[in-house]
């Protein structure tokens, strides 16, 4: 006897979806579902052996399809194909499935045939099914007993049917309704399968790195399938016996038509179809082979990206493919200008891994976190059929290569800044007396030097000298002129230089006119490019120091002497720095350098005092500092006149001989080398060579000043005679200095530096261990 029985619609409007006959169950999905192919359902008695032995009645289970679990198909043909693949018959897209009472048959096998279905429609529908979505398996099931419908061996491969202990517990859950198991109430049994679903483009909110196949249907209604090729390889294999049944990739799902018109799906013997399982939640979940419904977007494609890759596209966040979360595992982003993926109708869509397009600049990389990817800078990319963008332009077609004119601020030529006076910061009128000054400071300095004024500061010699307040304190203004380097001799020297250049130019022009064959003009005297020793001495000359003497307090010998000692200590320090800068001096032995400084410190201070007094006060006053000038009134103080008389002698001799600045620098250097120990220096030969060098420099300075060779030797004799006389002046000054240093009753303070020098020098002078280097014999 044939175990199959046709499933035909009833002739009455029966809302029940379950019809029971003697040898099997006939399932009717309402009247409104008719109009398509007829489903033949046969029930095998061996499929549910355990259930038939326990109860002779039919146990009814509800089929619950959560809302949103199946995507809405817009075409009626596609909906029919979906219904056929699931073993159901649906007439319209908006048709509702009434699943109040779905019973399990006692025997027979379920088979599927489509004798009245259009073959061409089936081929197109099955091809579309490969891109559609189906119901995933509930991850919360714990491998309880599952019922698999086994069709004929020629049509479908066999599936396994296991009945666990949980299914045996269903007997205890039967109510009074004929022993049937009711999992849901009547109002919960009606639901929509193909409803217009609005799938969100975002992730359903599942945990990261969780398989989309394990989505909870009861919690997330929008969760569908995800591409199997995008997941790990474990999803492509057959699950273990203890794991849930996962959809498999069929090698060939193209339908085959037998001679009698039945539809046959070919598959290998070792591949099992998805099973209809009974879960812990006591509902039946239908699982079909994993397919993906791929939406047809205009020119936007999906691109796979592994963690660490950089994808620069229109969207930087993970998207969901038709409602499936892609936040776990691989991520799919919208990208631009990627190749379209060629798909076959009998295969599932495979998302190939496409390398990301290199980004445009390193700055974008650093902002987006480029990882360890090696990127190519924008401008070197060359994609066929794609416009190459250059740096700085959005598109060559939108903005041609036009050289933008430079900004007016960068090209605007501003004139040179006005030159300022080095004394009062007013606008300078030129270089006066060797310094860039204004006309007012020029006249002031000339009158101050020639008028022999004795300026005294009413403050602390730190008055502000500017354009407005330059007339408030002449003493500070005069001090600032000296600090700037103003010198009356600079004007005369400049005139001589200009006169010499004019004479040389005139001589060259005359020679050129006499010899017209000469095309190259060579000056008679080429300027010396190598700096002379005199020019170096001018550079290293120490600045004028201030004593810090308060002129508002009544003068006294003790206060003046103490101030002079403090000033002398700072001048000694400046003299040490100056000596080390003299060319050749540092080549001497270190002990020789210290010895020469200890013997000559008073020579240097006295000669510099005479020069300042000669240049600033015409040798009538002693200009120790701009703020400490000893006039005739101060010279009359006790113990002051005799010492001032010796110092005025030096100033008067310089004034009488009209010593030039170059001559003064050479003479000052020779005074550093004017005294040595009787035993000689450790580097005596080098010392003699250095001393002879500066004697020759003094002769050059004399020739430069006089110009007439007949008077050069005479002037050299006068200047060297002055150097010899300095020994007597310094000897008198040292005797008075030693006396005040040893006499504690005078209470004259000495700075530490000066006290150390005097302490080391006293034994040498007392023993007579000093040799004077004189130019002339007495």
Curated annotation (Swiss-Prot):
GO terms for molecular function: DNA-binding transcription factor activity; nuclear glucocorticoid receptor activity; nuclear receptor activity; sequence-specific DNA binding; steroid binding; steroid hormone binding; zinc ion binding. Residues 134-150, 394-414 have a biased composition (Low complexity). A zinc finger (NR C4-type) spans 421-441, 457-481. Residues 485-778 are annotated as: Interaction with CLOCK. It comes from the Eukaryota. Residues 487-524 are annotated as: Hinge. Changing residue 210 to E: No effect on nuclear translocation or transactivation. Residues 525-759 form the NR LBD domain. It is found in: Cytoplasm; Nucleus; Mitochondrion; Cytoplasm, Cytoskeleton, Spindle. InterPro entries: Glcrtcd_rcpt, NHR-like_dom_sf, Nucl_hrmn_rcpt_lig-bd, Nuclear_hormone_rcpt_NR3, Nuclear_hrmn_rcpt, Znf_hrmn_rcpt, Znf_NHR/GATA. Residues 1-420 are annotated as: Modulating. Residues 421-486 bind DNA. GO terms for biological process: cellular response to glucocorticoid stimulus; cellular response to steroid hormone stimulus; chromatin organization; positive regulation of transcription by RNA polymerase II. Expressed in brain. Regions of high expression include CA1 and CA2 of hippocampus, dentate gyrus, paraventricular hypothalamus, lateral geniculate, lateral-medial amygdala, and cerebellum. In the cerebral cortex, laminar patterns of expression were apparent in all cortical layers, particularly the pyramidal cell-rich layers II/III and V. Composed of three domains: a modulating N-terminal domain, a DNA-binding domain and a C-terminal ligand-binding domain. The ligand-binding domain is required for correct chromosome segregation during mitosis although ligand binding is not required. Heteromultimeric cytoplasmic complex with HSP90AA1, HSPA1A/HSPA1B, and FKBP5 or another immunophilin such as PPID, STIP1, or the immunophilin homolog PPP5C. Upon ligand binding FKBP5 dissociates from the complex and FKBP4 takes its place, thereby linking the complex to dynein and mediating transport to the nucleus, where the complex dissociates. Probably forms a complex composed of chaperones HSP90 and HSP70, co-chaperones CDC37, PPP5C, TSC1 and client protein TSC2, CDK4, AKT, RAF1 and NR3C1; this complex does not contain co-chaperones STIP1/HOP and PTGES3/p23. Directly interacts with UNC45A. This is Glucocorticoid receptor. It comes from Saimiri sciureus (Common squirrel monkey). The gene is NR3C1.
């Amino acid at each position: 006897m044939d175990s199959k029985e046709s499933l035909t619609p009833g002739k009455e409007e029966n809302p029940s979806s379950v019809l029971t006959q003697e040898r099997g169950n006939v399932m009717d999905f309402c009247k409104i579902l008719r109009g398509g192919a007829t489903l033949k359902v046969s029930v095998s008695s061996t499929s549910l052996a355990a259930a038939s032995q326990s109860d002779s009645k039919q146990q009814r289970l509800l089929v619950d399809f959560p809302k949103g679990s199946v995507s809405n198909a817009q075409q009626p043909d596609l909906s029919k194909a979906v219904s056929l693949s699931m073993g159901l018959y649906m007439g319209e897209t908006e048709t509702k499935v009434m699943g109040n009472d779905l019973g399990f048959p006692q025997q027979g096998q379920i088979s599927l045939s489509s004798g009245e279905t259009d073959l061409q429609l089936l081929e197109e529908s099955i091809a579309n099914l490969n891109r559609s979505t189906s119901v995933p398996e509930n991850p919360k099931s714990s491998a309880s007993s599952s019922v698999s419908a086994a069709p004929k061996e020629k049509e479908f491969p066999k599936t396994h049917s296991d009945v666990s202990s949980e299914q045996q517990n269903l007997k205890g859950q039967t109510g009074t309704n004929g022993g049937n198991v009711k999992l849901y109430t009547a109002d919960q049994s009606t639901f929509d399968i193909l409803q217009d679903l609005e799938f969100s483009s975002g992730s359903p909110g599942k945990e990261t790195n969780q398989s989309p196949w394990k989505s909870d249907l009861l919690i997330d209604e929008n969760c569908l399938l995800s591409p199997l090729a995008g997941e790990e390889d474990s999803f492509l294999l057959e699950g273990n016996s203890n794991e849930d049944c996962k959809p498999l990739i069929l090698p060939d799902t193209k339908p085959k038509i037998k001679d009698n018109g039945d539809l046959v799906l070919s598959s290998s013997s070792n591949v099992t179809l998805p099973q209809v399982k009974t879960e812990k939640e006591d509902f039946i979940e239908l699982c079909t082979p994993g397919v993906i419904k791929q939406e047809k977007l205009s020119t936007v494609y999906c691109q796979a990206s592994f963690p660490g890759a950089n994808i620069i596209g229109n969207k930087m966040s993970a998207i969901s493919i038709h409602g499936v979360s892609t936040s776990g595992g691989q991520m799919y982003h919208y990208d631009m200008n990627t190749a379209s993926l060629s798909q076959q109708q009998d295969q599932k869509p495979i998302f190939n891994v496409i390398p990301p397009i290199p980004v445009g600049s390193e700055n974008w990389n650093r902002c987006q976190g480029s990882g360890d990817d090696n990127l190519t800078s924008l401008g070197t990319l060359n994609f066929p059929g794609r416009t190459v963008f250059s740096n700085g332009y959005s598109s060559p077609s939108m903005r041609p290569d036009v050289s933008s004119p430079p900004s007016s601020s960068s090209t605007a030529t501003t004139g040179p800044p006005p030159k300022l006076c080095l004394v009062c910061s007013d606008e300078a009128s030129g270089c006066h007396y060797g310094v860039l000054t204004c006309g007012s400071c020029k006249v002031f300095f000339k009158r101050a030097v020639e008028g022999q004024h004795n300026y005294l500061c009413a403050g602390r010699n730190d008055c502000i000298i500017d354009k407005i307040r330059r007339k408030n304190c002449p003493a500070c203004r005069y001090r600032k002129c000296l600090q700037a380097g103003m010198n009356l001799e600079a004007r005369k020297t400049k005139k001589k230089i200009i006169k010499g250049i004019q004479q040389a130019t005139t001589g060259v022009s005359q020679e050129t006119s006499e010899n017209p064959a000469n095309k190259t003009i060579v000056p008679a005297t080429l300027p010396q490019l190598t700096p002379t020793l005199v020019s170096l001495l001018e550079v290293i000359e120490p600045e004028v120091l201030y004593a810090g003497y308060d002129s508002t307090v009544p003068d006294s010998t003790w206060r003046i002497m103490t101030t002079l000692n403090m000033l002398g200590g700072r001048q000694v320090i400046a003299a040490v720095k100056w000596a080390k800068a003299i060319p050749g001096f540092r080549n001497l032995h270190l002990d020789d350098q210290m010895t020469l400084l200890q013997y000559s410190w008073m020579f240097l201070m006295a000669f510099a005092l005479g020069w300042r007094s000669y240049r600033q006060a015409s040798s009538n006053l002693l200009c120790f500092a701009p703020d400490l000038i000893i006039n005739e009134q101060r010279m009359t103080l006790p113990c002051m006149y005799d010492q001032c008389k010796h110092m005025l002698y030096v100033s008067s001799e310089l004034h009488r001989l009209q010593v030039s600045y170059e001559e003064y620098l050479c003479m000052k250097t020779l005074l550093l080398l004017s005294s040595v120990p009787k035993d000689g220096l450790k580097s005596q030969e080098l010392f003699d060579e250095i001393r002879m060098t500066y004697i020759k420099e003094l002769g050059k300075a004399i020739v430069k000043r006089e110009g007439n060779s007949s008077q050069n030797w005479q002037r050299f004799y006068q200047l060297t005679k002055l150097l010899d006389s300095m020994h007597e002046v310094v000897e008198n000054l040292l005797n008075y200095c030693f006396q005040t240093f040893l006499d504690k009753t005078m209470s004259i303070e000495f700075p530490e530096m000066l006290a150390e020098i005097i302490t080391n020098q006293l034994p040498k002078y007392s023993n007579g261990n000093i040799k004077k280097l004189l130019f002339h014999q007495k």
